Amino acid sequence: MNSFLEPYKDSYLLKILIAIAVFLFSLVTNAQIDRNTDLYKTLKAKDSIIFQRAFNKCELEKLEPIIAENFEFYHDLAGIQNRKEFMLAMKNNICGNPGRITRQLVAASLEVFPLKNNGVLYGAIQKGKHTFQEKNNTEIKTVGIADFTDLWILENNSWKLKRVLSYNHKPYKG
């Protein structure tokens, strides 16, 4: 069976059009913002509040103001949680045994993609990888790694975490 492009297989114009299409696609797929922008730095700081302060140190009062009222958390192992369920799980599970499990951002993996409506910034997608450490007595061992994707929405000039996908959890083999 012949491809519909068979008559054009030797066409110079077709090769140019394909090259242009590949170039344009690469621009779109690499549209993350520079790490020196205010948006990148702001959302990296928000990530730090979520994990360094709330997850690692159990300062949950730092977390509540940045979580949207209609927040949803999707976890590949623990299921779906709304805002109330997520905060309760943080309190009872993560902070129920403080210092046992901690999270570290894989800094080089963090990417931020702005979301705009007619040129006006309304949100951003933040994604990356993180590792999880377990503390036994004085030994700290990296035990897991996972991917995350966060949807941030700008509400009244304040960034709110609206959706989180936490997935690809697996044992760390580093």
Q: Language-model segments: which ranges?
A:
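Short, low-complexity N-terminal intrinsically disordered segments enriched in polar/charged residues
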Residues: 21, 29-69
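Short beta-strand edge/turn micro-motifs at domain boundaries
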Residues: 143-172
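A short acidic/glycine-rich loop-to-helix N-cap element
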Residues: 32-34, 137-143, 171-174
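A solvent-exposed, acidic/Ser-Thr-rich amphipathic alpha-helical stretch
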Residues: 40-41, 59-129, 142
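Beta-strand elements of well-folded, non-transmembrane domains
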Residues: 130-136, 152
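Short beta-strand segments enriched in hydrophobic/aromatic residues
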Residues: 67, 130-132, 165-168
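Bacterial Sec-dependent N-terminal signal peptides
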Residues: 1-37
